[in-house]
Curated annotation (Swiss-Prot):
Name of the protein: Uracil phosphoribosyltransferase
Pathway terms, separated by semicolons: Pyrimidine metabolism; UMP biosynthesis via salvage pathway; UMP from uracil: step 1/1
UniProt keyword annotation of Nucleus present: no
GO biological process, one term: UMP salvage
Cofactor comment text: Binds 1 Mg(2+) ion per subunit. The magnesium is bound as Mg-PRPP.
Enzyme class: transferase
Protein family (similarity comment): Belongs to the UPRTase family.
PANTHER family registered for this protein in UniProt: ADENINE PHOSPHORIBOSYLTRANSFERASE (PTHR32315), URACIL PHOSPHORIBOSYLTRANSFERASE, CHLOROPLASTIC (PTHR32315:SF4)
Gene name of this polypeptide: upp
Amino acid sequence: MSKVTQITHPLILHKLALIRDKRTGSKDFRELVEEVAMLMAYEVTRNLQTEEVEIETPICNTTCKMLSGKKVAVVPILRAGLGMVGGMLKLIPAAKVGHIGLYRDETTLKPVEYFCKLPQDIGEREVIVTDPMLATGGSAIDAITMLKQKGAKNIRLMCLIAAEDGIKSVTEAHPDVDIYTAAIDKELNKNGYIVPGLGDAGDRLYGTK
């Protein structure tokens, strides 16, 4: 069954409050989203495997631990998920980046695919899917399904704010996928937006609707 981890570090909570504030402009919003993603990356990557390696310091030879095993792929759900990639890459610069393009039909509220490009070795990588908002869960479910169809086996979902309905939907559809979020909001409005949420993350990141 999926594990849901809410990351409540004081720095994350502070920056998330600024992200939620409607007075925060696109420039600051982008920077804050990237910063929160970088802070969350510490917890999201906690279980990456390490191995002992021999190195030489200026003083002597010694044994240290470095990442081993499967490499990482960060896969944003376009377009809003792109805002979290920079923060992840600052801590995992060797990660490859895939892209899944989905948009929400404003009438049906269901996701529609328009783009998919992934690393060829996606099945050999630890995959971190990024999307600031987990609302109905439809986009995340479809993105994870696409990844599995391409061979991905180890997938985690990382978001800034998750609605309880979205968490329930994803855990039921993909019980093997762990979810990491900075906040859990209780409800969705009639338009499928998280309440209180932060509005439309893509619009606020890029200043376009």
